[in-house]
């Protein structure tokens, strides 16, 4: 086996306490996630992870939906604990009986242990069966008074690695208005007011990532003024988006064809933000005109 460590979080707890929100939060944090994992399969799955160079941060939901849960969970945990390559923690989500009943009434779903349809009986039985596992858990979160956003933030605070920004990513993209607005954009900025390199013959076939085009776009006084205001607008609001529990913020910058001005601006913005935040840069339409010409 590899001597590289696996960071494993087992997510468990009361049905209706927020495990779906939790596993989605771990996915946003960059964990490899599986919901409703049968306990007997966990050790074999971890062996496969150890043999690859894939993501070694793993979050697994193991709960009462697996009917053989308690016949296997203790041996599974013993197996994990005896493996020096695995660092694991248990996150147990709980809520009051009254809150769980209320949530089940709202969703109109049946409780996995309510054989006769009585939700409260199922909750009480589940609480009794889960009591030993709860006592073993390193993290117990009472979600009774938590909104989904607050639960996501709680998980981010406890399980994100590195800086505060680890659970928050900024997507900076360029696009061409002639090809339509990006549907996933949160913030859209229009730079069509800037001088267009398209009308410079020597720049027409290049993109905003080419040095001469980039310098042409960013050297105009209008560009300098707008870029300064753009940073002053975006930078202060990023912590607020993160605080609200948003995992990805997409900032889109558009020009006519998405080849020159928007590409240069998006590249410049991405580089500036990357000093303090996790940033991905993409250019949706920078080669669109060339592809159209080639097909014609």
From Swiss-Prot:
GO molecular-function term, one example from the UniProt record: ATP binding
- Cite the binding residues for GTP: 63-66
The UniProt keywords, alphabetically, are: ATP-binding, GTP-binding, Nucleotide-binding
Q: Which residues bind ATP?
A: 13-20
Q: Name one Pfam family in it.
A: RapZ-like_N
What protein family is recorded?
A: Belongs to the RapZ-like family.
Q: What HAMAP family has UniProt attached to this entry? A: RapZ_like (MF_00636)
Function, in words: Displays ATPase and GTPase activities.
Q: What is this protein called?
A: Nucleotide-binding protein M28_Spy0517
